Amino acid sequence: MVRVVIESELVRTEKELPNSLKLRQFKDRLYHVTGVEPEDMEIVVKRQYDNKEIYSTKKGGAYSNEDEDANFLKGEEELIVVVTDSNAQSISNQLATQAEGIPSMEVISEEDYLRRDQSVLRWKMAHGYGRFNAAQQSQRAALAKQDEAYAREQLTAAIGRHCRVTVDGSAPREAILRYVGPLPLDVMGTWCGVEFPEAAGKNDGRINGVTLFGPVAPGHGSFVRPRAVEILSKDEESAEVEDVHDDVESDDEI
Protein backbone atom coordinates (compact mmCIF):
# COMPACT_ATOMS: atom_id res chain seq x y z
CA MET A 1 0.00 0.00 0.00
CA VAL A 2 1.06 3.59 -0.61
CA ARG A 3 -0.15 6.60 1.36
CA VAL A 4 -1.50 9.28 -0.98
CA VAL A 5 -2.64 12.84 -0.33
CA ILE A 6 -5.26 13.67 -2.97
CA GLU A 7 -5.86 17.34 -3.74
CA SER A 8 -8.52 18.97 -5.91
CA GLU A 9 -10.46 22.24 -5.92
CA LEU A 10 -12.95 20.91 -3.36
CA VAL A 11 -11.07 18.38 -1.27
CA ARG A 12 -7.71 17.47 0.21
CA THR A 13 -7.72 14.07 1.83
CA GLU A 14 -5.44 11.13 2.58
CA LYS A 15 -5.94 7.57 1.39
CA GLU A 16 -3.98 4.34 1.18
CA LEU A 17 -3.97 2.81 -2.29
CA PRO A 18 -2.73 -0.57 -3.51
CA ASN A 19 0.52 -0.20 -5.42
CA SER A 20 -0.69 -2.78 -7.96
CA LEU A 21 -3.36 -0.55 -9.56
CA LYS A 22 -3.67 -0.10 -13.30
CA LEU A 23 -3.85 3.47 -14.62
CA ARG A 24 -7.56 3.00 -15.37
CA GLN A 25 -8.21 1.80 -11.80
CA PHE A 26 -6.17 4.68 -10.39
CA LYS A 27 -8.31 7.24 -12.23
CA ASP A 28 -11.46 5.53 -11.02
CA ARG A 29 -10.25 5.79 -7.40
CA LEU A 30 -9.57 9.50 -7.93
CA TYR A 31 -13.05 9.99 -9.37
CA HIS A 32 -14.70 8.59 -6.26
CA VAL A 33 -12.69 10.98 -4.07
CA THR A 34 -12.76 14.18 -6.16
CA GLY A 35 -15.88 13.81 -8.29
CA VAL A 36 -13.88 14.82 -11.38
CA GLU A 37 -14.80 12.70 -14.41
CA PRO A 38 -11.83 10.54 -15.54
CA GLU A 39 -11.87 11.96 -19.07
CA ASP A 40 -11.59 15.51 -17.65
CA MET A 41 -8.72 14.83 -15.25
CA GLU A 42 -5.33 16.48 -15.39
CA ILE A 43 -3.14 14.61 -12.92
CA VAL A 44 0.20 15.49 -11.35
CA VAL A 45 1.88 12.99 -9.03
CA LYS A 46 4.70 14.18 -6.73
CA ARG A 47 6.85 12.57 -4.09
CA GLN A 48 5.86 13.98 -0.73
CA TYR A 49 9.35 14.21 0.78
CA ASP A 50 10.90 16.41 -1.93
CA ASN A 51 7.86 17.55 -3.97
CA LYS A 52 9.44 16.17 -7.16
CA GLU A 53 7.01 15.49 -10.00
CA ILE A 54 7.17 11.85 -11.12
CA TYR A 55 4.09 11.57 -13.34
CA SER A 56 1.65 13.90 -15.09
CA THR A 57 -0.98 14.08 -17.81
CA LYS A 58 -1.64 17.06 -20.04
CA LYS A 59 -4.90 18.81 -20.80
CA GLY A 60 -6.87 16.99 -23.48
CA GLY A 61 -4.44 14.10 -23.41
CA ALA A 62 -4.93 10.47 -22.52
CA TYR A 63 -2.81 7.64 -21.21
CA SER A 64 -0.93 5.81 -23.91
CA ASN A 65 -2.31 2.61 -22.44
CA GLU A 66 -4.64 2.80 -19.46
CA ASP A 67 -4.24 -0.94 -18.95
CA GLU A 68 -0.61 -0.49 -17.94
CA ASP A 69 0.44 -0.52 -14.31
CA ALA A 70 0.47 2.77 -12.42
CA ASN A 71 4.20 2.31 -11.86
CA PHE A 72 4.54 5.57 -9.94
CA LEU A 73 2.71 3.88 -7.05
CA LYS A 74 5.49 1.32 -6.69
CA GLY A 75 8.45 1.96 -4.44
CA GLU A 76 7.08 5.24 -3.10
CA GLU A 77 5.78 5.35 0.48
CA GLU A 78 4.05 8.75 0.36
CA LEU A 79 2.76 10.68 -2.64
CA ILE A 80 0.80 13.84 -3.42
CA VAL A 81 -1.71 13.59 -6.27
CA VAL A 82 -3.12 16.86 -7.62
CA VAL A 83 -6.27 16.48 -9.73
CA THR A 84 -7.40 19.41 -11.89
CA ASP A 85 -10.70 19.44 -13.78
CA SER A 86 -9.99 20.51 -17.38
CA ASN A 87 -13.70 20.92 -18.16
CA ALA A 88 -14.62 24.51 -17.27
CA GLN A 89 -18.34 23.68 -17.47
CA SER A 90 -18.21 20.62 -15.21
CA ILE A 91 -20.19 20.32 -12.01
CA SER A 92 -17.03 20.17 -9.89
CA ASN A 93 -15.71 23.43 -11.34
CA GLN A 94 -19.07 25.14 -10.87
CA LEU A 95 -19.23 24.02 -7.25
CA ALA A 96 -15.63 25.08 -6.67
CA THR A 97 -16.51 28.56 -7.93
CA GLN A 98 -19.53 28.75 -5.64
CA ALA A 99 -17.86 27.26 -2.57
CA GLU A 100 -17.03 29.67 0.28
CA GLY A 101 -15.36 29.15 3.61
CA ILE A 102 -13.66 25.89 2.66
CA PRO A 103 -9.91 26.07 3.40
CA SER A 104 -8.25 24.69 0.28
CA MET A 105 -5.37 23.02 2.13
CA GLU A 106 -7.40 21.48 4.95
CA VAL A 107 -6.95 17.72 5.11
CA ILE A 108 -10.33 16.07 5.64
CA SER A 109 -11.57 12.52 5.61
CA GLU A 110 -13.48 11.15 2.65
CA GLU A 111 -16.52 10.74 4.92
CA ASP A 112 -16.45 14.43 5.90
CA TYR A 113 -16.07 15.38 2.26
CA LEU A 114 -19.15 13.39 1.29
CA ARG A 115 -21.16 15.07 4.06
CA ARG A 116 -20.41 18.57 2.80
CA ASP A 117 -23.16 20.41 0.95
CA GLN A 118 -20.63 21.42 -1.73
CA SER A 119 -19.42 17.86 -2.32
CA VAL A 120 -19.40 17.00 -6.02
CA LEU A 121 -20.31 13.39 -5.30
CA ARG A 122 -23.14 14.49 -3.01
CA TRP A 123 -24.50 16.67 -5.80
CA LYS A 124 -24.22 13.86 -8.34
CA MET A 125 -25.92 11.37 -6.04
CA ALA A 126 -28.73 13.81 -5.22
CA HIS A 127 -29.34 14.79 -8.84
CA GLY A 128 -28.75 11.43 -10.50
CA TYR A 129 -25.78 12.67 -12.48
CA GLY A 130 -23.26 10.51 -14.35
CA ARG A 131 -22.73 7.14 -12.67
CA PHE A 132 -25.55 7.87 -10.23
CA ASN A 133 -28.11 8.23 -13.04
CA ALA A 134 -30.37 5.18 -12.64
CA ALA A 135 -31.91 5.55 -16.10
CA GLN A 136 -28.47 5.81 -17.68
CA GLN A 137 -27.22 2.77 -15.80
CA SER A 138 -30.33 0.83 -16.87
CA GLN A 139 -29.67 1.80 -20.48
CA ARG A 140 -26.06 0.64 -20.20
CA ALA A 141 -27.22 -2.67 -18.74
CA ALA A 142 -29.62 -3.12 -21.67
CA LEU A 143 -26.83 -2.36 -24.16
CA ALA A 144 -24.57 -4.87 -22.42
CA LYS A 145 -27.30 -7.52 -22.68
CA GLN A 146 -27.72 -6.79 -26.39
CA ASP A 147 -23.94 -7.00 -26.84
CA GLU A 148 -23.84 -10.42 -25.20
CA ALA A 149 -26.62 -11.78 -27.43
CA TYR A 150 -25.11 -10.32 -30.62
CA ALA A 151 -21.67 -11.69 -29.79
CA ARG A 152 -23.02 -15.12 -28.93
CA GLU A 153 -25.41 -15.47 -31.88
CA GLN A 154 -23.43 -13.83 -34.69
CA LEU A 155 -19.90 -12.67 -33.94
CA THR A 156 -18.35 -15.80 -32.41
CA ALA A 157 -18.99 -17.71 -35.64
CA ALA A 158 -17.60 -14.83 -37.71
CA ILE A 159 -14.05 -14.79 -36.32
CA GLY A 160 -11.65 -14.35 -39.24
CA ARG A 161 -14.20 -12.41 -41.30
CA HIS A 162 -13.81 -8.84 -42.51
CA CYS A 163 -15.81 -6.30 -40.56
CA ARG A 164 -16.55 -2.60 -40.25
CA VAL A 165 -15.76 -0.96 -36.90
CA THR A 166 -17.58 2.23 -35.84
CA VAL A 167 -16.94 3.62 -32.35
CA ASP A 168 -18.87 6.59 -30.92
CA GLY A 169 -19.74 8.11 -34.28
CA SER A 170 -16.15 8.15 -35.56
CA ALA A 171 -15.44 7.28 -39.18
CA PRO A 172 -15.86 3.55 -39.95
CA ARG A 173 -12.68 1.49 -40.13
CA GLU A 174 -12.31 -1.82 -41.91
CA ALA A 175 -10.76 -4.67 -39.96
CA ILE A 176 -10.69 -8.42 -39.46
CA LEU A 177 -12.48 -9.88 -36.45
CA ARG A 178 -9.88 -11.87 -34.48
CA TYR A 179 -11.32 -12.42 -30.99
CA VAL A 180 -14.64 -12.49 -29.13
CA GLY A 181 -14.70 -12.84 -25.35
CA PRO A 182 -13.78 -11.24 -22.02
CA LEU A 183 -10.69 -9.15 -21.33
CA PRO A 184 -8.15 -9.72 -18.51
CA LEU A 185 -9.09 -6.34 -17.01
CA ASP A 186 -11.58 -4.88 -14.55
CA VAL A 187 -14.05 -4.22 -17.38
CA MET A 188 -17.29 -6.11 -17.69
CA GLY A 189 -18.83 -7.98 -20.59
CA THR A 190 -17.77 -9.32 -23.95
CA TRP A 191 -15.29 -7.53 -26.20
CA CYS A 192 -14.20 -8.03 -29.81
CA GLY A 193 -10.56 -8.03 -30.86
CA VAL A 194 -10.03 -6.60 -34.33
CA GLU A 195 -6.99 -6.25 -36.59
CA PHE A 196 -6.67 -3.18 -38.82
CA PRO A 197 -4.66 -3.13 -42.07
CA GLU A 198 -3.06 0.12 -40.91
CA ALA A 199 -1.95 1.47 -37.54
CA ALA A 200 -5.44 2.72 -36.67
CA GLY A 201 -5.78 0.83 -33.40
CA LYS A 202 -4.65 0.87 -29.78
CA ASN A 203 -2.46 -2.21 -29.30
CA ASP A 204 -1.03 -5.37 -30.87
CA GLY A 205 -3.63 -7.88 -29.69
CA ARG A 206 -2.22 -8.17 -26.19
CA ILE A 207 -3.85 -6.83 -23.03
CA ASN A 208 -2.22 -6.79 -19.62
CA GLY A 209 0.50 -9.12 -20.88
CA VAL A 210 -2.02 -11.66 -22.21
CA THR A 211 -2.10 -12.41 -25.96
CA LEU A 212 -5.73 -12.61 -27.08
CA PHE A 213 -4.92 -12.61 -30.80
CA GLY A 214 -1.80 -12.18 -32.90
CA PRO A 215 0.24 -10.47 -31.71
CA VAL A 216 -0.02 -8.16 -34.71
CA ALA A 217 2.01 -5.08 -35.61
CA PRO A 218 1.93 -2.32 -32.97
CA GLY A 219 -1.16 -0.13 -33.31
CA HIS A 220 -2.90 -2.57 -35.65
CA GLY A 221 -5.12 -4.10 -32.96
CA SER A 222 -7.99 -2.87 -30.79
CA PHE A 223 -10.71 -4.25 -28.55
CA VAL A 224 -14.18 -2.81 -29.04
CA ARG A 225 -17.70 -3.52 -27.84
CA PRO A 226 -19.68 -5.97 -30.02
CA ARG A 227 -22.13 -3.22 -31.03
CA ALA A 228 -19.26 -1.44 -32.79
CA VAL A 229 -18.67 -4.40 -35.13
CA GLU A 230 -20.57 -5.05 -38.36
CA ILE A 231 -19.64 -8.20 -40.29
CA LEU A 232 -19.27 -7.46 -44.00
CA SER A 233 -21.04 -9.42 -46.68
CA LYS A 234 -19.00 -11.40 -49.19
CA ASP A 235 -19.53 -8.67 -51.78
CA GLU A 236 -18.38 -5.97 -49.36
CA GLU A 237 -15.33 -8.01 -48.39
CA SER A 238 -14.15 -8.13 -52.00
CA ALA A 239 -14.77 -4.43 -52.64
CA GLU A 240 -12.05 -1.89 -52.01
CA VAL A 241 -13.18 0.57 -49.34
CA GLU A 242 -10.98 3.43 -48.16
CA ASP A 243 -10.06 3.05 -44.49
CA VAL A 244 -10.53 6.39 -42.71
CA HIS A 245 -9.54 6.80 -39.08
CA ASP A 246 -10.38 9.64 -36.72
CA ASP A 247 -8.31 9.67 -33.55
CA VAL A 248 -11.26 9.65 -31.15
CA GLU A 249 -10.86 8.52 -27.56
CA SER A 250 -13.66 6.29 -26.28
CA ASP A 251 -14.33 4.05 -23.32
CA ASP A 252 -15.72 1.55 -25.85
CA GLU A 253 -12.31 0.98 -27.47
CA ILE A 254 -9.22 -0.39 -25.76
Swiss-Prot record:
Present with 656 molecules/cell in log phase SD medium. It is found in: Cytoplasm; Cytoplasm, Cytoskeleton. Residues 182-225 form the CAP-Gly domain. Pfam families: CAP_GLY, Ubiquitin_2. One of its GO terms (molecular function) is alpha-tubulin binding. Acts to sequester alpha-tubulin from interaction with beta-tubulin, raising the possibility that it plays a regulatory role in the formation of the tubulin heterodimer. Belongs to the TBCB family. Signal peptide: none annotated. The keyword Cytoplasm applies. Binds to monomeric alpha-tubulin. Keywords: Chaperone, Cytoplasm, Cytoskeleton, Microtubule. The gene is ALF1. This is Tubulin-specific chaperone B.
